[in-house]
Curated annotation (Swiss-Prot):
Organism of provenance: Mycobacterium tuberculosis (strain ATCC 25618 / H37Rv)
Pathway field: Cell wall biogenesis; peptidoglycan biosynthesis
Gene behind this protein: murG
Protein name per Swiss-Prot or TrEMBL: UDP-N-acetylglucosamine--N-acetylmuramyl-(pentapeptide) pyrophosphoryl-undecaprenol N-acetylglucosamine transferase
Organism classification: Bacteria, Bacillati, Actinomycetota, Actinomycetes, Mycobacteriales
Family label: Belongs to the glycosyltransferase 28 family. MurG subfamily.
Annotated InterPro entries: GlcNAc_MurG, Glyco_trans_28_C, GlycoTrans_28_N
Record carries keyword ATP-binding: no
Misc remark: Was identified as a high-confidence drug target.
NCBIfam families: murG (TIGR01133)
Length: 410
């Protein structure tokens, strides 16, 4: 088995050990007569890469013979995340969409076709049976290549495409690709993609299979919380969130007075200013990041977090009530991501500008001292969460790959 990164121009390979809890994949470069070759096109941010890796693990669990190739670019997190998960990565030219007229816009067509040619070479090299796309810079070239482009110098076979959209508002690549895709899957009903089947967002197996009640005692001991504690979990993504850090740390005294323990991942570049803990105060555990999110989720009773698609998917999948604080940029995508859970009663949305220490103290203390309301929110979050999204996407990919039958030529 070879877990490598291949650059567009034939760069050096890179290897990484595979996590112990992940299935053993088949490398994309070892074809066999009866194995299915799947190309996963999802790069750039963790929101694109993590669902792809969850689907990769689900594919291997369904069919250990499957050959998986991840498609990415040099500028994305996939150069680190994919080899860490033990999968083969092929790199193509990144084609970001220019935000304003200029030289980048004039060069866009040539960059697109270069990326399409590179993607097509990868599809041919691994004898791809299906492309599963997750949006982002790498997806559109993969979709076009799968359609049989570019045509010269020889006629190309068409490769089936399955699209997954994690966000409540579909991005450009998936909007374009959905017109000709064989299957279109989405996280929520109103993504804007025609023919979309709602499956949720694929999450890691360690999260999808998490039984918080079973793991709670171990998780709380791990972080130093009493078994009967009321625990607030706070995180703002891999880099933390300054506004969440300020609001929650500013409420530390009030939270302690209410008997609330805090597990706060503040980000590796951030420092929390916390008051000196008084004797008898509940623990306030501040860490740069959490590398065992399943333990963090199991320890918690309530979460304050951003509302990225992956965050909402994981928090709802494990049935945690949440106070979602959408990132105040873009077109409100994060707020839309949280709305299905909020509308079902599994959480609430607080605007970033409205998140103050006073609000944190009032809302958190109110929720954690109201067992009936917290239990209702927990049940609502669990009903909305999708634990088998990765399996559903994987099964769709295998069905399309094997059920498409004869490969058509365009």
């Amino acid at each position: 088995m070879k877990d490598t990164v291949s650059q567009p121009a034939g760069g050096r390979g890179a290897t990484a050990p595979r996590p112990a809890d992940a299935a053993s994949p088949s490398c994309g470069s070892s074809p066999s007569a009866d194995s299915v070759s799947v190309v996963l096109a999802g790069g750039g941010t963790a929101g694109h890469v993590e669902p792809a890796m969850a689907v990769a693990d689900a594919l291997v669990a369904l069919d250990p013979r499957v050959r998986i190739t991840a498609l990415g670019t040099l500028r994305g997190l996939e150069t680190r995340l994919v080899p860490q998960r033990g999968y083969h990565l092929e790199l193509i030219t990144a084609v970001p969409m220019p935000r304003k007229p200029g030289g980048d816009l004039a060069r866009l067509p040539s960059r697109v076709w270069r990326a399409v040619r590179e993607a097509r070479d990868v599809l041919d090299d691994v004898d791809a049976d299906v492309v599963v796309g997750f949006g982002g810079y790498v997806a559109l070239p993969a979709y076009l290549a799968a359609r049989g482009l570019p045509l010269p110098p020889r006629r190309r076979r068409r490769i089936p495409v399955v699209i997954h959209e994690a966000n409540a508002r579909a991005g450009l690549a998936n909007r374009v690709g959905a017109h000709t895709a064989d299957r279109v899957l989405s996280a929520v009903p109103d993504s804007g993609l025609r023919r979309a089947e709602v499956v949720g967002v694929p999450v890691r197996a360690s999260i999808a299979a998490l039984d918080r009640a079973v793991l709670r005692a171990e998780a709380r001991a791990h972080f130093g919380f009493p078994d009967d504690a009321r625990v607030l979990l706070v995180f703002g993504g891999s880099q933390g969130a300054v506004s969440l850090n300020r609001a929650v740390s500013g409420a530390a005294a009030d939270l302690a007075a209410a008997g609330v323990c805090v597990l706060h991942a503040h980000g590796p570049q951030n420092v929390l200013e916390l008051r000196r803990r008084a004797q008898g105060d509940p623990p306030y555990v501040a860490v740069p990041y959490l590398d065992r999110m399943e333990l963090a989720y199991a320890a918690a009773d309530l979460v304050i977090c951003r509302a990225g698609a992956m965050t909402v998917a994981e928090v709802s999948a494990v049935g945690l009530p949440a106070i979602y604080v959408p990132l105040p940029i873009g077109n409100g995508e994060q707020r839309l991501n949280a709305l299905p859970v909020v509308n079902a009663g599994g959480g609430m949305v607080v605007a970033d500008a409205a998140l103050t220490p006073e609000l944190v103290a009032r809302q958190v203390a109110g929720l954690l001292t109201d067992p009936a309301r917290l239990a209702a929110m927990t049940a609502a979050a669990a009903r909305v969460g999708h634990r088998d999204a990765a399996g559903q996407v994987a099964r769709a990919a295998l069905a399309v790959a094997t059920g498409a039958g004869a490969r058509t030529t365009t």
